[in-house]
Amino acid sequence: MPQPALSDQDNAISRTLVGARLSAEPLPDFPIQLPTSLEQAYAIQSASIERWPDELVGWKVAMLSPAEQQRFKAQRLVGPVFRSSFHTVEAGSSIVMPVYRDGFAAVEAEIVFVLGETIPPTGRDYSDAELASFIATVSAGAEIASSPMKVINDLGAMSVISDFGNNAGVIAGPAVPNWATQKPGFLTATVTVDDATVGSK
């Protein structure tokens, strides 16, 4: 979406959010003032992506709450995934992922799509078949949601979008064979803790 020129205040918000992540220092609250629009929040996010010393390789996508969908006229939000925090694991293996001490941390079940080519932006919606043609692999996975700001989710979508979508990493499992011939919804990702399922998608 078109983004406004970044104000001095929003530039300061971006610097503070990025600085907290780089230093792993907790933030007690959102810095300065919450954005009031999607355009403002994504402008802050874009500035932070430019500041971040890593390569952008993908996006996490999350659903907005029903109230926020109505308020902002959008269904989903996105946040960046960077190369150093994207990992693939083989079946039966494990990986240790860092989170922000004294901040927010969660593990969320995800379905991970790895694209074989970039999807060109257009002025129309792509069909499901067209979108599927861009996908190289599909796998069950997990998102490490973490931020130096413990209250990031409590403050809502404007806070989450501004701070990298509350993303700190993505783990992709083995690629699912023959995924393109399966019916929608054939794959379920689950998160278990001590053999108890705590989340699924």
Report residues per predicted region:
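Catalytic-core "active-site belt" of small-molecule-metabolizing enzymes
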Residues: 2-201
